[in-house]
């Protein structure tokens, strides 16, 4: 990165820090104008993780909170809205919390974490403990919000449920102005509770907390909540009639989470890496919120931060590496029926599927059926929508190369689990390989291909398609005890796919995998064997004492394969 260029804000979610420390910032302050003009008392934005939700919440806090520093907004879109700035900038007490850290293996641990989050926020307003505008009993209640013992907040359960409402009422009373409430990652406590078995207790706590502060609260100017999922009204928003939910299918605010194509081109140009545009678009674009197509901000920023110093950098999986990806693993495991398996194959091939989407699920029902899982995949960013059929059913697709590669990785991972469970078939396949029984290798490998989800991706080059079948073979061979397996290592005059040394028997295997364009399996097999001979791949095995070496040319096309073998012995 050149001296004088703005730094890239990798992992920074503080608007104030980004502006104060001169980081590169893509202007999303137009969201402030829309919030005020389109006005809803309670706004819930649901977007996948790493799409700028927390940064936007930080931006809202910086704009509305009393004591706002106007210089933070100089040169930004909202600064041109002089009347809005005059009436709203720095005019409100703001309660701003993130529930991202509210988790634990038990309800007690999680509720203690919630006390900590709310207690620390209440600590930001120490003047309330001496405010002459509060009654003595109210000042005592405020003190109870911030009291600690041995480093832990001690507020009672009934006060915890009332805590946000109570704090908003005290702030409004002290300042004579209504309060703006910002709750980031509102659904994380429910997600963690579902994982660890105390879901009903957490639902009851969050429902009470939210209803008290959001429903008929005279001290509330408006509230903004963000999260990944829209949780059913019947679950935690019971009786809340003023809730405006803005999901990935809504056109309102469509460009304020994620980077637009123009914004990405400007960023690449600023850092003099416009030549990376094609790769960035293929790997990180493709998400559709409302009618807007956007890039994942996390991916773009991470890639650019490394690409400026490495012109040969190939796109990496940044977004998918920030999660356990348990959702996609469950999805692949649930593809038991032939219909669902063919649907996954269609998605990986770049096609769209029409599915009815439910945006108001509960965590208890997320994994009840494959139909619910489609909705979850859309909400969490593993799939995106390409338009609607009737307002309830949407055209779903994998957004980009990054997520497509994640699907492939999980498909191979599931395949390996299945191979490990079927020891009898594994033994038969390996026995056929080490004896040069090409017809049996072909039959068993075809069975394996039929068992797994096939890859017929029209968007990638042939070597990438070959890598998938290569991965299947490695997934099989990796479980064979006593076999030393090497993959894609440099040989005397080039690279070969797979080398296997069976030390106890002085047998070696050389396997070259080819993807058969247009299904020309015989021709692809011959090319594979010819490559093994011409590139002298067998030299390493001879040097290591193998006296029998089988050369395998394996050609694949979707769920078909052809196997040819040549034997050398001395």
Predicted regions and their residues:
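Walker A/P-loop-proximal flanking segment of P-loop NTPase domains
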Residues: 1-81
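Conserved P-loop NTPase mechanochemical-coupling segment
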Residues: 10-19, 109, 113-161, 189-194
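P-loop NTPase motor core
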Residues: 11, 62-127
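Substrate-engagement module of ASCE P-loop NTPases
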Residues: 122, 163-174, 201-221, 537-540
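Structural recognition of the conserved hydrophobic beta-strand(s) that form the central parallel beta-sheet
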Residues: 180-184, 208, 221-228
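Extended alpha-helical interface modules used as scaffolds for assembling large macromolecular complexes
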Residues: 243-244, 295-536, 561-570
């Amino acid at each position: 990165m050149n001296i004088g260029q703005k730094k890239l804000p990798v992992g920074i979610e503080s608007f104030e820090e980004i502006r104060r420390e001169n980081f590169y910032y893509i202007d999303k302050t137009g969201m402030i104008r829309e919030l005020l003009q389109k006005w809803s008392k309670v706004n819930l934005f649901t977007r996948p993780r790493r799409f700028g939700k927390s940064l936007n919440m930080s931006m809202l806090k910086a704009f509305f909170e009393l004591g706002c520093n106007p210089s933070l907004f100089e040169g930004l879109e909202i600064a041109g809205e002089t009347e809005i700035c005059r009436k709203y900038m720095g005019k409100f007490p703001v309660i701003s919390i993130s529930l991202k850290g509210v988790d634990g293996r038990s309800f007690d641990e999680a509720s203690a974490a919630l006390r900590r989050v709310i207690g620390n926020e209440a600590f930001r307003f120490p003047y309330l403990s001496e405010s002459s505008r509060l009654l003595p009993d109210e000042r005592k209640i405020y003190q109870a919000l911030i009291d600690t013992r041995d480093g832990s907040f001690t507020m009672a359960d009934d006060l915890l449920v009332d805590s946000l409402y109570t704090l908003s009422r005290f702030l409004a009373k002290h300042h004579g102005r209504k309060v703006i409430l910002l709750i980031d990652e509102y659904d994380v406590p429910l997600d963690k509770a579902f994982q660890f078995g105390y879901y009903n207790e957490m639902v009851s706590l969050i429902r009470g907390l939210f209803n008290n502060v959001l429903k008929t609260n005279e001290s509330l100017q408006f509230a903004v909540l963000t999260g990944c999922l829209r949780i059913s009204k019947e679950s935690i928003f019971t009786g809340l009639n003023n809730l405006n939910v803005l999901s990935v299918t809504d056109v309102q605010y469509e460009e304020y989470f994620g980077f637009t194509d123009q914004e990405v081109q400007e960023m690449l140009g600023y850092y003099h890496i416009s030549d990376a545009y094609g790769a960035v678009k293929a790997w990180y674009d493709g998400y559709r919120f409302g009618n807007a197509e956007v890039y994942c901000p996390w991916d773009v920023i991470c890639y650019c931060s490394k690409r400026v110093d490495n012109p040969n950098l190939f796109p990496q999986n940044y977004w998918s590496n920030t999660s356990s990806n348990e959702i996609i693993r469950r999805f692949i495991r649930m593809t038991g029926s032939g219909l669902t398996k063919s649907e996954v194959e269609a998605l990986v091939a770049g096609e769209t599927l029409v599915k009815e989407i439910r945006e108001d699920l509960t965590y208890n029902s997320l994994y009840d059926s494959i139909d619910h899982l489609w909705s979850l995949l859309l909400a969490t960013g593993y799939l995106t929508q390409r338009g609607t059929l009737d307002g309830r059913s949407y055209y779903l697709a994998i957004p980009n190369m990054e997520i497509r590669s994640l699907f492939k990785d999980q498909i191979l991972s599931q395949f390996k689990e299945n191979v490990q469970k079927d020891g009898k078939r594994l033994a038969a396949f390996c026995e056929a390989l080490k004896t040069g029984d090409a017809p049996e290798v072909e039959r068993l490998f075809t069975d394996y291909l039929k068992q797994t989800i096939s890859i017929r991706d029209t968007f990638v080059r042939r070597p990438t398609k070959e890598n998938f079948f290569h991965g299947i073979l490695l997934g099989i061979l990796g479980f064979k005890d006593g076999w030393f397996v090497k993959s894609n290592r440099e040989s005397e005059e080039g690279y070969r796919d797979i080398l296997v040394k069976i030390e106890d028997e002085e047998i070696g295997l050389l396997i070259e995998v080819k993807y058969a364009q247009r299904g020309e399996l015989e021709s692809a097999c011959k090319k594979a064997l010819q490559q093994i001979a011409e590139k002298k791949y067998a030299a390493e095995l001879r040097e290591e004492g193998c006296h029998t070496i089988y050369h395998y040319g394996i050609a694949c096309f979707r769920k078909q394969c052809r196997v040819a073998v040549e034997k050398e012995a001395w």
